[in-house]
Amino acid sequence: MKSLKYLLPALAFLVLVGFFYRGLFLDPRTVPSPLIGKPAPVFELEELSNPAETFATSDMLGKPALLNVWATWCVGCRQEHSFLMQLARTGEIDMYGMNLRDERPKALDWLRRLGNPYAKVAFDPDGAGSLDWGVYGSPETFLIDPQGIIVYKHLGPLGPAAWMEEFRPRIAAMQGGAQ
């Protein structure tokens, strides 16, 4: 009985080490979102460039849309920005932004200097609007179908590989197979 008393903590420790070791090899970008297949969370925030106007979930209905959560302090956001500008020029999809935990003048200056790929940008200075979306960092990009259902969530900078492998096939499926 005494040996079992010492063996149980050792076994528990080994199990924890096993879980930790397994976790080292998981890709954090593949964390499934509980929002996939569910309606996009309802929000209504000030529009970044014009606080008298609002940007709401309903603005993204009717066609496939991207919602990109970004910030000026985010290194990954700077990395993906040139790709977002290229994507905006193609007109493949309506793109919207949500500026997260930022200062309005800094965000406006960022878009003025680097270009604005978004049709509208929600200003979320305290992060309250992004909480319902399950955002815990930036950049994060959501693909939303015409009915407002979240189809896919991408963590980290968006680039050509993720666009071609993850987004394009889903958009084609929404459009009946046409690319």
Named regions from a protein language model:
Residues M1-E46, Q179:
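N-terminal targeting signals for export/organelle localization
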Residues Y6, R112-P117, D124-Q175, Q179:
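Thiol/disulfide oxidoreductase modules built on the thioredoxin-like
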Residues P41-E44, W70, Y96, L131:
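Conserved Rossmann-like nucleotide-binding pocket used by diverse enzymes
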Residues F43-L66:
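A short beta-strand-turn-helix
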Residues T72-Q79, L131-D132, E140:
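C-type cytochrome heme c attachment motif
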Residues R78-G115, P125-L131:
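Structural microenvironment flanking redox-active thiols in thiol-disulfide oxidoreductases
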